[in-house]
């Protein structure tokens, strides 16, 4: 049964596990917000919005995006559902994909090392979410939230610069960043935070401090792996916590919406026009190392037909997201 405590030093390293990808890549989905079974508001795609996860050689069949939702707990220290070596994070995001029975592919259940009877109806991607204050800007006001919940981010157009013709927060294929220089970049960005080579996008170059950080050779502390040496099991899998600024703003506004905040019963919904991509809550592409196991849904009926893909690298959202989610009345 899921969730589980992942013991990293007992995990078996597999060099050939597939990369986590989506088809079509970077597709923006129109979603509406509904009340999840455990009263966690979830973002479900509108009819006609199709997006699939690709995990070749791990699962067969087509798995279609079903929803995004976020879990938190009674305390900040134990908010995530999964844990690694007994350590939790304040929240955990789940990207849920359901087998598309409209295709001609039957779902299979493939255990590492061989197949066994049964099948996976779901693929769920779990992401550990940390919270922070720095780098997320001012709280969005009501007018800004109205624009965001209609599918338009005020500082984001898909391929270019931010408001007023300057270089603001950029979209998926942006270049320059926050201060009109090279700041926070999109997935295919170049330079990073301080106008130099800082935080890069998926196809960027240098890491945190203009040296070899996230997408360079070395890990978090300028050396190899998580703790300045070689990472878990001796493999060089360094992580740097990505700040999910755009996602934070969307979640803040959605959870603050009057109707969403007053969700009490399962099945309640609010037709907010929110544009999301599955990339938003995920680490950059080159840092999507993951643990995978076969388990169950974490809410009733707790069906044991889920392939879990739990991201090793964490993502940070604004602390305001945590407070807003806790203020949803029925949660």
Swiss-Prot record:
Location of the region described as 24 X 3 AA approximate tandem repeats of G-X-N in the Swiss-Prot/TrEMBL record: 162-233
Annotated residues that bind substrate are located at 298-299
Top-level EC class: lyase
Q: What is its main location?
A: secreted
Q: Does the keyword S-adenosyl-L-methionine apply?
A: no
- In residue numbers, the region (Disordered) covers 138-240
What is its quaternary makeup? Homooligomer; disulfide-linked. May also be disulfide-linked to insoluble organic matrix.
Function of the protein: Acts as a negative regulator for calcification in the shells of mollusks. May function both as a calcium concentrator and as a carbonic anhydrase required for production of carbonate ions, which are assembled to CaCO(3) at mineralization sites. Is important for shell formation in both the calcitic prismatic layer and the aragonitic nacreous layer. Shows inhibitory activity of crystal formation when present in free state but, when attached to the insoluble matrix, may regulate the form and size of aragonite crystal.
According to its UniProt record, which protein family does this protein belong to?
Belongs to the alpha-carbonic anhydrase family.
Name of the molecule in the record: Nacrein-like protein P1
Question: Which organism is the protein's source?
Answer: Mizuhopecten yessoensis (Japanese scallop)
């Amino acid at each position: 049964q899921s969730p589980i405590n992942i013991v990293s030093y007992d995990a078996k390293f597999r060099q050939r596990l597939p990369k986590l990808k989506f088809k079509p890549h970077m597709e923006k989905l129109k979603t509406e917000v509904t009340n999840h079974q455990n009263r966690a508001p979830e973002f479900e795609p509108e009819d006609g919005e199709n997006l699939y996860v690709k995990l070749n050689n791990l699962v067969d069949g087509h798995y279609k995006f079903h929803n995004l939702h976020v879990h938190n707990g009674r305390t900040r220290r134990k908010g995530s559902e999964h844990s690694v070596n007994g350590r939790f994070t304040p929240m955990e995001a789940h990207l849920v994909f359901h087998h598309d029975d409209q295709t001609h592919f039957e779902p299979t259940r493939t255990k590492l090392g061989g197949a066994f009877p049964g099948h996976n109806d779901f693929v769920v991607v779990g992401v550990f979410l940390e919270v922070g204050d720095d780098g997320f800007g001012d709280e969005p006001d009501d007018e800004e939230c109205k624009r965001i919940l209609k599918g338009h981010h005020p500082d984001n157009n898909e391929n270019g610069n931010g408001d007023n013709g300057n270089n603001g927060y950029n979209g998926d294929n942006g270049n320059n960043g926050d201060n009109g220089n090279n700041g926070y970049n999109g997935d295919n960005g170049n330079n990073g935070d301080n106008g130099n080579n800082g935080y890069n996008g998926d196809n960027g170059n240098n890491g945190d401090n203009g040296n070899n950080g996230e997408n360079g050779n070395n890990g978090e502390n300028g050396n190899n792996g998580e703790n300045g040496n070689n990472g878990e099991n001796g493999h060089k899998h360094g992580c740097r916590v990505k700040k999910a600024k755009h996602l934070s703003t969307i979640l803040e506004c959605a959870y603050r919406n009057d109707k969403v905040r007053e969700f009490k019963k399962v099945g309640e919904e609010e037709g907010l026009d929110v544009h999301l991509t599955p990339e938003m809550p995920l680490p950059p592409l080159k840092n999507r190392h993951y643990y995978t196991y076969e388990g169950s849904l974490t809410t009733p009926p707790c069906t044991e037909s889920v392939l879990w893909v739990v991201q090793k690298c964490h993502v940070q959202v604004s602390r305001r997201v945590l407070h807003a989610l806790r203020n949803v009345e029925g949660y």
